[in-house]
Regions:
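N-terminal secretory signal peptides that target proteins for export/translocation
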Residues: 1-14
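N-terminal export leaders
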Residues: 16-20
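C-terminal segment of N-terminal export signals and the immediately downstream linker at the start
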Residues: 35-44
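Catalytic alpha-helical scaffold of carbohydrate-active enzymes acting on polysaccharides/glycoconjugates
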Residues: 43-196, 201-244, 267-289, 297-337
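Glycine-rich, positively charged active-site loop/lid region within alpha/beta enzyme cores that binds
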Residues: 242-260
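Substrate-binding clefts and catalytic carboxylate motifs of secreted carbohydrate-active enzymes
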Residues: 294
Length: 337
């Protein structure tokens, strides 16, 4: 990272710095308490006055490197299906912000009490290995979730932060301390050290990738530079870190918001996901879907997931795997091991 970039970031106020790190992520802006500053003077940090060096340094912090999509997936399959569940529960219903309210917390408990068992039952019945990303506190509050997931022996539990904290608003030492705490807590409860990481709110601070590499994760799954697996590049340096990219249209939360204006009929959502899968199958790449038990696990919504799985199973050459299995496969095929 260039000295010009570091010095300018240090001069930016805490709110503006948070805005810079969020770079348009609405959820992050709200959590940081930032108002729209488009009509305010930003003096030296006005983007149109930034130097070439600064812009390139900012953009090059974390970029997509080489394409890691293999010629084929395990068993000669043409497409990989990776189903993932961010088991946020109470953490995203108030704990992450400190805005404690009993009603929203009850929605979080629905995740562990009703929705997760419903989801795991479906995955087990369909024989679909899946990856469950936990903020550590979601697991600490209901550790029985680990037994439920691990009983079949085919699913993966991975890390999703400590308390679904806004990592982009934290200094480096705090972000690292919380993630190391999370990894240790998940290992203590599950008996297995997580090898995968998904950042809360799908965003990186300038420190996140360094921390993830230092901890020794096998893969990362928070960014959106492709819809195929790729290697992360940090400040121009190939990292050897596999990115399994995500995408908002392949996330249940923004589509099923009954209190907002983005709610979609579950059968319409199913068709969107089917179309995404069909194109991935046609291209011979990867279909990665992110869901949340407390969202997809409601009765009317899990119908969309049931229909999607039925459709995917009707096609030839489909491999269902955990994120860990996919990451290990692409590393091997790319000669990274």
């Amino acid at each position: 990272m260039s000295s010009a970039f570091i010095s300018l970031v240090k001069r930016i106020s805490s709110q503006r710095r948070c805005l810079l790190l969020a770079l348009g992520a609405a959820a992050t802006m709200v959590a940081c308490g930032i108002q729209d500053t488009s009509d305010q003077s930003m003096e030296a940090d006005e983007p149109w006055n930034w130097s070439d060096e600064f812009v390139r340094s900012a953009v090059d912090q974390v970029r997509a490197g080489r394409d890691l999509n293999p010629d084929s997936w395990p068993g000669g399959a043409r497409v990989a299906v990776l189903l993932s569940y961010d088991v946020d529960n109470e953490t995203v219903q108030g704990l992450r912000t400190g805005n404690i309210s009993i009603g929203p917390l009850s929605q979080g408990q629905y995740g562990s009490r009703v929705a997760l068992p419903r989801v795991v039952k479906l995955m087990n019945e369909q024989g679909v290995p899946s990856t469950f990303f936990f903020p550590a506190w979601s697991l600490k509050l209901a550790p029985e979730q680990a037994d439920l997931i691990q009983e079949s022996g085919m699913h993966e539990i991975a890390a999703h932060g400590w308390i679904h904290e806004l990592n982009t608003a934290l200094d480096g030492p705090t972000e690292e301390r919380l993630l190391r705490q999370a990894v240790d807590a998940i290992e203590e409860i599950t008996g297995t050290r997580p090898v995968g990481y998904r950042a809360p709110s799908w965003n990186h601070s300038p420190n996140t990738l360094r921390i993830v590499r230092d901890i020794g994760f096998l893969y990362e799954s928070s960014l959106m530079a492709d819809d195929r697996p790729y290697e992360l590049v940090q400040n121009g340096e190939p990292t050897g870190m596999v990115e399994l990219p995500v995408e908002w249209i392949l996330d249940d939360a923004p589509l099923f918001n009954p209190r907002g204006n983005s709610y979609m009929n579950p059968r319409d959502v199913m068709q969107v996901w089917i179309d995404e899968f069909d194109k991935a199958w046609e291209e011979g790449t990867m279909f990665l879907l992110t869901m949340h038990p407390h969202v997809i696990g409601h009765r009317s919504r899990i119908i969309a997931l049931e229909g999607l799985i039925e459709h995917m199973k009707s096609r030839d050459g489909v491999w269902f795997g955990t994120h860990e299995a996919a990451a290990r496969w692409v590393r091997k095929q790319a000669g990274m091991d």
